[in-house]
């Protein structure tokens, strides 16, 4: 006979008592352990209590397995105080579920938001701003102050919010193709709702504009920033969708990454330092160098997305001419850019530190050749193409890290 068909009598708060008449042999504990309802957290003692006084023994013999707390008239717990002992562990766990759920949801949303802002470009923008401002500060160390650093930090926040705004629009309107090309993005992976994405995008645009006004950046910088907010929207938002056309996509990258951001940051940096804007040779070099890279990156960015672009009908250069052709052409122009940088250092030693520029760009060029060879060896698979494109971003970041130290 199973123990679960017995009546139980709770005489003490820490024990369950079961009548000995219910056990078929003296080896009661062995039978008890064999039962699927054995409870390890409370010791069980046997007593001489007879169940016939409270329920029929005939029913006990024929009752099917119901469990210690099943809905049966003979299985209700009974205590001296006529009150069942509350399960304090269960109650505590229910009380602790609420804060635990809040923490988990907050952590998941934070992780999805970090993926939403695209970490690699986010870090790249931070380095670009720091490098351009740092180059001006190194030339004028006497102007350093903590208030200056605080104002510069607020300017960095403006640029980062602009970056979130641009990337947010791009992900919202590219959701269908991202499910194929970039399934790890939070919207494509359904880790974040479209409503939350819109909130982050609009908040970033409004907050950055308000911060610009608070910093009193002047009419020229504020109007220029508003223009880039509009141009950034036209890149992704229908019916414009400049990114769908190779020419308009390249033009946007050239104006935004190559000229716009660099000019905006340098102008703001010198204004913060109380200096007039000036076209110095190092700044002219970085504008020309990065503008060329921005054109190359706008072409090569579609190499990892060939399959998805074909399915959604996007006519990108890798789709038309093939990934291998575009990669070889893009890498070739990248190498020419490095050759030009070495030539500039040789021709204008009075403006540039050749002992830094020449070996650094030679190393960058060698690394690019090796990475292109690895991509060709991998037959331009998506994973290898992603790695190659990210490596190009690292090369551009390395150029900005080098920038404050190339000027004589």
UniProtKB/Swiss-Prot annotation:
Predominant localisation class: plastid
Location of this chain's protein in the cell: Plastid; Plastid, Chloroplast membrane
Family: Belongs to the UbiA prenyltransferase family.
Organism: Humulus lupulus (European hop)
Tissue spec: Expressed in trichomes.
Entry GO MF terms: transferase activity, transferring alkyl or aryl (other than methyl) groups
InterPro entries: UbiA_prenyltransferase, UbiA_sf
Transmembrane residue ranges: 119-139, 146-166, 193-213, 217-237, 257-277, 281-301, 326-346, 355-375, 388-408
Enzyme Commission (EC) number: 2.5.1.137
UniProt xrefs under PANTHER family: HOMOGENTISATE SOLANESYLTRANSFERASE, CHLOROPLASTIC (PTHR43009:SF10)
First and last residues of the transit peptide: 1-46
Record flagged with keyword Metal-binding: no
Taxonomic lineage: Eukaryota, Viridiplantae, Streptophyta, Embryophyta, Tracheophyta
Membrane topology: Multi-pass membrane protein
Sorted UniProt keywords: Chloroplast, Membrane, Plastid, Transferase, Transit peptide, Transmembrane, Transmembrane helix
Protein's recorded name: 2-acyl-4-prenylphloroglucinol 6-prenyltransferase, chloroplastic
This protein's pathway: Secondary metabolite biosynthesis
């Amino acid at each position: 006979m199973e123990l679960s068909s017995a009546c139980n009598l709770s005489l003490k708060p820490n024990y369950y008592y079961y009548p000995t008449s219910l056990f078929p042999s003296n080896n009661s504990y062995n039978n008890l352990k064999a039962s699927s309802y054995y409870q390890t957290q409370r010791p069980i003692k046997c007593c001489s209590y007879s169940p016939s006084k409270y329920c029929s023994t005939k029913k006990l013999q024929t009752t099917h397995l119901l469990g210690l707390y099943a809905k049966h008239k003979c299985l209700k717990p009974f205590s001296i105080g006529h009150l069942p002992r509350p399960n304090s562990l269960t109650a505590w766990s229910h009380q602790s579920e609420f804060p635990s759920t809040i923490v988990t949801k907050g952590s998941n949303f934070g992780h999805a938001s970090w993926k939403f802002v695209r970490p690699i470009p986010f870090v790249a923008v931070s380095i670009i701003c720091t490098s351009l401002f740092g180059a001006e500060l190194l030339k004028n160390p006497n102007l350093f102050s903590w208030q200056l650093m605080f104002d510069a930090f607020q300017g960095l926040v403006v640029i980062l919010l602009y970056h979130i705004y641009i990337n947010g629009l791009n992900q919202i309107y590219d959701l269908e193709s991202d499910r194929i090309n970039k399934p790890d993005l939070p919207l494509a992976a359904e880790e974040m709702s479209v409503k939350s994405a819109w909130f982050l995008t609009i908040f970033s645009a409004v907050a950055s504009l308000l911060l610009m006004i608070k910093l009193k950046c002047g009419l020229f910088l504020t109007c220029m920033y508003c223009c880039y907010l509009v141009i950034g929207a036209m890149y992704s938002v229908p019916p414009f969708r400049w990114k769908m056309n190779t020419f308009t996509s390249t033009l946007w990258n050239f104006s935004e990454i190559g000229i716009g951001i660099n000019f905006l940051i340098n102008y703001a940096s010198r204004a913060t330092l109380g200096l007039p804007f000036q076209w110095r040779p190092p700044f002219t070099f970085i504008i020309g160098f990065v503008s060329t890279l921005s054109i190359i990156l706008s072409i090569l960015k579609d190499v990892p997305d060939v399959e998805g672009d074909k399915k959604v009908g996007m006519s990108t250069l890798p789709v038309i001419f093939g990934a291998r052709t575009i990669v070889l052409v893009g890498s070739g122009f990248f190498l020419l850019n490095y050759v030009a940088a070495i030539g500039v250092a040789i021709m204008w030693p009075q403006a540039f530190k050749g002992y830094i520029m020449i070996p650094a760009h030679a190393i960058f060029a060698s690394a690019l050749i090796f990475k292109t060879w690895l991509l060709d060896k991998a037959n331009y698979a998506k994973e290898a193409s992603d790695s190659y494109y990210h490596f190009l971003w690292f090369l551009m970041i390395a150029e900005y890290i080098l920038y404050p130290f190339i000027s004589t």
